[in-house]
Amino acid sequence: MGIFSIANQHIRFAVKLACAIVLALFIGFHFQLETPRWAVLTAAIVAAGPAFAAGGEPYSGAIRYRGMLRIIGTFIGCIAALIIIISMIRAPLLMILVCCVWAGFCTWISSLVRIENSYAWGLSGYTALIIVITIQMEPLLTPQFALERCSEIVIGIGCAILADLLFSPRSIKQEVDRELDSLLVAQYQLMQLCIKHGDSEEVDNAWGDLVRRTAALEGMRSNLNMESSRWVRANRRLKALNTLSLTLITQSCETYLIQNTRPELITDTFRELFETPVETVQDVHRQLKRMRRVIVWTGERETPVTLYSWVGAATRYLLLKRGVISNTKISATEEEILQGEPVVKVESAERHHAMVNFWRTTLSCILGTLFWLWTGWTSGNGAMVMIAVVTSLAMRLPNPRMVCIDFIYGTLAALPLGLLYFLVIIPNTQQSMLLLCLSLAVLGFFIGIEVQKRRLGSMGALASTINIIVLDNPMTFHFSQFLDSALGQIVGCMLAFIVILLVRDKSKDRTGRVLLNQFVSAAVSAMTTNVVRRKENRLPALYQQLFLLMNKFPGDLPKFRLALTMIIAHQRLRDAPIPVNEDLSVFHRQLRRTADHVISAGSDDKRRRYFGQLLDELDIYQEKLRIWEAPPQVTEPVKRLTGMLHKYQNALTDS
């Protein structure tokens, strides 16, 4: 396919984007809004953003969800702007500097919350800055401007959602159904590899791929939940299926590790069962039936605990999978599974990274302020707005430098494109609403094609072009103003890029170490006799951290194996029959406190000291288990955990 070719699957969304832009433009001028540009710009960004992220037409619900986040972020930003202006109207410079800090604060929060919700916080940061900069000459008009901006943005979002509904958005349900079947087959094949105890690299690739697919399935669940309220039952089942899929991965990998020291635990009967190849979910179903009969015949005690747990989890997976596909009423058996264990949310390991993002956004906005005041450039405020927009949106993504480059390319492309519209097209079509709408529809259609291809600069070009062409009421054509706006966008993106290059993010290694220590803390916290604590389901949170580790350090197998070993230790100790007595309970609390000190230590020396203390306490704990005659199901996992911590002590303590 050529670089400028148009694929059939891209046409529907391109028409959808064009329709959203035209609707926003028509309503904006029909109701005599002062700046219909905001409504058009909002409709374009809300519709095109999910398509750029997805690399194609977004699934149903994605545009609505992004629109709701934009409304929330706009209202938070407007309220913050009003508070700042009312408090500091007599000190304009201080007011702008406080807005710069507010933008940095919102970026800091957006770096810590879920990536899906971070958009609202990033938006609220630069919305406040836009309002404060715009009303510098007429501060008494702040409430009116804030109200107009909110109204125009709500209109733009409404147009994007209406266009999405008119052109029958894609449902993700069929993709979810197919992935559930494919995932179960892949889980079975992973267990086959682990039973064979073959090449470790092949096993690593298999479980790593399953972790990524399970994370992707969780993302699909979020999309399905946004799509319609009729998928509430499917959403509940998919939440439980996420835990079951992670449980299957854990049990398979533990089976592999057990065979490193005790291969005799896996009997010939189960080895023969897992030699049968499977290709479909029906094949897996038949094999699970055979395994359940074998387990009943041999007895639970004669079955390795990992295989017994794996078969049980796979059976529950099949039951819930059928419920998701049919979306029928939840049965009593399913309800028992769904009411299982409360899922625990883990604390973010990227606090240092979030602080770097705070300083990047704050410093770039302050730099823009100084540049504006020093030069006295009439479009310095436009450059400041672009700085805030670029840094707020770029910081929450894995590669902020590429986001900046995308914006730079986009603003450069917007200059000739905007020039064409400003000098030729809009002056010749402003007397006819139909021609004006058609001209912008053509712009939206062709950029909509490129956005779905993730063409570098396409998203920035769409937003920047709409921002600089004259879509105000009434229209005024001042070439110097147009040129200032276009150059202001380019300069703002350049300054933001310079700040991102200068303020280096060196938090990667620290984040990796914090993640690994959180795995250690989770394994240690599983050593408890508290019934409520033992029922807590930390597995989704632990695998979420593992997924983050895999993204931060692609290809670093030793780190992945260490993290997975800690997850296995956590699951095994969580189910271990630890003797219930006050002596052990007190020592469990001491172990948890020491593990928390390891995570929160501010220097390598403190971290090494606390880690050494943790190792000493684990040695004492093993002695206590021997005194209290704990069974091998407890002593062996604790011994393995202690050995792993001794082996990887340097990796867990050094920066």
From Swiss-Prot:
It is a multi-pass membrane protein. It is found in: Cell inner membrane. Disulfide bonds: none annotated. GO terms for biological process: carboxylic acid transport. It holds the Pfam family FUSC. Keywords: Cell inner membrane, Cell membrane, Membrane, Transmembrane, Transmembrane helix, Transport. GO terms for cellular component: plasma membrane. GO terms for molecular function: transmembrane transporter activity. The chain crosses the membrane at residues 13-33, 38-58, 69-89, 93-113, 121-141, 152-172, 370-390, 407-427, 431-451, 459-479, 482-502. Forms an efflux pump with AaeA. Could function as a metabolic relief valve, allowing to eliminate certain compounds when they accumulate to high levels in the cell. This is p-hydroxybenzoic acid efflux pump subunit AaeB. The gene is aaeB.
